[in-house]
């Protein structure tokens, strides 16, 4: 869609040129790459390039130059540091330092202890999560209690409500 909007904004001649390039793009890409490789290797043997292909290569070079002009990075030394330097992590006095995992005492041949410790740790996490969810649910119950005190009064029936009955749809 963006490409279509861009094409509409271009002149008729440019659209024709772009359609021509698009129609011959596959064959052109192969030839253009070969042409660039030969040019970069500074081989002086002339290539058999048709005038059409030469025109296409000029168009593509022009488009690439325009693209590079518009998308050039600002000049200057490359940034080696991020814009906002990272602050070193400071441990608060309340935090306990993280200890490396220590294998429970026992033989390595007994995987039961390892399984038990893993299971115990997951149960502990599950308990903490369930406590957290219970706390959230309790907060939700408090909100429901507050909502019940803020109920709006029932709408009183007006005489004009009876008129609405006259226009009811009957099946």
From Swiss-Prot:
> Which residue windows does the record flag with biased composition (Basic and acidic residues)?
141-160
**Source organism of the structure:** African swine fever virus (isolate Warthog/Namibia/Wart80/1980) (ASFV)
Question: What is this protein identified as?
Answer: Uncharacterized protein H171R
Task: State where it is primarily located.
Answer: virion
Induction of the gene: Expressed in the late phase of the viral replicative cycle.
List the top taxonomic levels of the source: Viruses, Varidnaviria, Bamfordvirae, Nucleocytoviricota, Pokkesviricetes
* UniProt keyword terms in alphabetical order: Late protein, Virion
Q: Name one GO cellular component term.
A: virion component
Q: Does the keyword Metal-binding apply?
A: no
By sequence similarity, the record places it as follows: Belongs to the asfivirus H171R family.
UniProt-annotated stretches for the region Disordered: 68-124, 140-171
Q: Origin, by domain of life?
A: Viruses
Q: Which compartment or compartments is the protein found in?
A: Virion
């Amino acid at each position: 869609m963006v490409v279509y909007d861009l094409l509409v904004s271009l002149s008729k001649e440019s659209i024709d040129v772009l359609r021509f390039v698009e129609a011959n793009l596959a064959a052109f890409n192969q030839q253009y790459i070969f042409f660039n490789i030969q040019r970069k290797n500074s081989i002086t043997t002339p290539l058999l390039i048709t005038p059409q292909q030469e025109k296409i290569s000029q168009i593509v070079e022009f488009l690439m130059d325009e693209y590079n002009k518009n998308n050039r990075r600002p000049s200057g030394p490359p940034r080696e540091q991020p814009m906002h330097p990272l602050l070193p992590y400071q441990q608060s006095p309340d935090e306990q330092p993280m200890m490396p995992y220590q294998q429970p005492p026992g033989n390595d041949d007994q995987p039961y202890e390892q399984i038990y410790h893993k299971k115990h740790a997951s149960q502990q996490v599950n308990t903490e999560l369930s406590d957290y969810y219970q706390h959230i649910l309790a907060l939700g119950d408090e909100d429901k209690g507050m909502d019940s005190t803020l109920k709006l009064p029932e709408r009183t029936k007006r005489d004009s409500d009876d008129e609405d009955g006259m226009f009811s749809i009957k099946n």
